């Protein structure tokens, strides 16, 4: 192989057995059958390609350091490796697919592929009544279903013009169950994030306390998840007996658990090494990408809709908005831990504000008869109780039948309502054409928007830090794809 021979011509010579190959006697290379070498004058002997005739044809053997040159492979620094992470991957928080372009251990490009969990929730709402739509929307972000219910019902109540008619007790209970679910959501983030970084104790602790919160929500709503508890006009039912006592017991125990998390993780060298100065995104980057929630507050901007654009009477509660300045994964961890403590304060204030009263608006043309729920003593089954609630006239029975089967009508119009979910701004754009079903329901899910920050968080970093970046954003793919 001469110095002026190109790779392609050399390859052709090897493939076709061109005349520049020199034959060798049978067995000359210690192999039975004709053998030879391919090369030319002045070729370095270490770069010679030898061949052997066999029953299956000519077999070539390349020695030396020229394998990449013969194959035409580019320089090592120009190599491009594309790796798929997901959609079936334990560290992507659902069916999220990440297409990573890497050089060595450095990520040069991150592309997100979503849609694997699309269920058509928004479209399904257009074929159900205003109340039935809650059953679909509660399944969007399945780690914070009560926030989806609350944002949607607040939108419907604005269209109906009954925001001020919602009973105070119903509003207080709404705030209380939302803050309990905020704690549960952050505990899932702590548990899954700890598991992905190898902190299995954090996983056990996080899910242990989350079970306690889910037990409370099951006691109150009847279900651990996907509650359909918040309805247009109020709530599906009142608090059961013993709920307040169980919540107070949880409030007495949870602060000690949060201190345990700090003792376990905050000063842990490996935990800090994996998170400090990793996946940094400053406030300007968050604003440019539309990022909200703990990711934005960890960059130093105290934007919390409970304070900046209050709803459900949040302006009357005493609580702080935790922030940090570093904008890295460790700052997001600290912000979420502090938020759990602030949510405990709000729940405690809710218990102090609970007063006897209804949990549904008085307008029977809108409200389902929540009083028909079966109590622990069996009330709700007796004919006398049903007569008391429903009345005895045929008109009352007809009205109830039409309310449940056909639904109430909502005046034509459109509203956008946003609330602060565990992951950021959760917005609902609800459109009515004056009928008994929504004309359009669009969800501004915070996980969908926040995921757009993942390339900015991960590009230029290590492959191992991609897991940390996705975990620090805390996406829920049910809300992303819906």
UniProtKB/Swiss-Prot annotation:
<feature type="compositionally biased region" description="Low complexity">
    <location>
        <begin position="1"/>
        <end position="16"/>
    </location>
</feature>
<keyword id="KW-1003">Cell membrane</keyword>
<dbReference type="GO" id="GO:0048038">
    <property type="term" value="F:quinone binding"/>
</dbReference>
<keyword id="KW-0813">Transport</keyword>
<dbReference type="GO" id="GO:0050136">
    <property type="term" value="F:NADH:ubiquinone reductase (non-electrogenic) activity"/>
</dbReference>
<keyword id="KW-0874">Quinone</keyword>
<dbReference type="InterPro" id="IPR022885">
    <property type="entry name" value="NDH1_su_D/H"/>
</dbReference>
<dbReference type="GO" id="GO:0051287">
    <property type="term" value="F:NAD binding"/>
</dbReference>
<comment type="function">
    <text>NDH-1 shuttles electrons from NADH, via FMN and iron-sulfur (Fe-S) centers, to quinones in the respiratory chain. The immediate electron acceptor for the enzyme in this species is believed to be a menaquinone. Couples the redox reaction to proton translocation (for every two electrons transferred, four hydrogen ions are translocated across the cytoplasmic membrane), and thus conserves the redox energy in a proton gradient.</text>
</comment>
<keyword id="KW-0472">Membrane</keyword>
<keyword id="KW-0520">NAD</keyword>
<comment type="subunit">
    <text>NDH-1 is composed of 14 different subunits. Subunits NuoB, C, D, E, F, and G constitute the peripheral sector of the complex.</text>
</comment>
<feature type="compositionally biased region" description="Gly residues">
    <location>
        <begin position="29"/>
        <end position="42"/>
    </location>
</feature>
<dbReference type="GO" id="GO:0005886">
    <property type="term" value="C:plasma membrane"/>
</dbReference>
<dbReference type="InterPro" id="IPR001135">
    <property type="entry name" value="NADH_Q_OxRdtase_suD"/>
</dbReference>
<dbReference type="Pfam" id="PF00346">
    <property type="entry name" value="Complex1_49kDa"/>
</dbReference>
<comment type="similarity">
    <text>Belongs to the complex I 49 kDa subunit family.</text>
</comment>
<protein>
    <recommendedName>
        <fullName>NADH-quinone oxidoreductase subunit D</fullName>
        <ecNumber>7.1.1.-</ecNumber>
    </recommendedName>
</protein>
<feature type="region of interest" description="Disordered">
    <location>
        <begin position="1"/>
        <end position="48"/>
    </location>
</feature>
<keyword id="KW-1278">Translocase</keyword>
<dbReference type="InterPro" id="IPR029014">
    <property type="entry name" value="NiFe-Hase_large"/>
</dbReference>
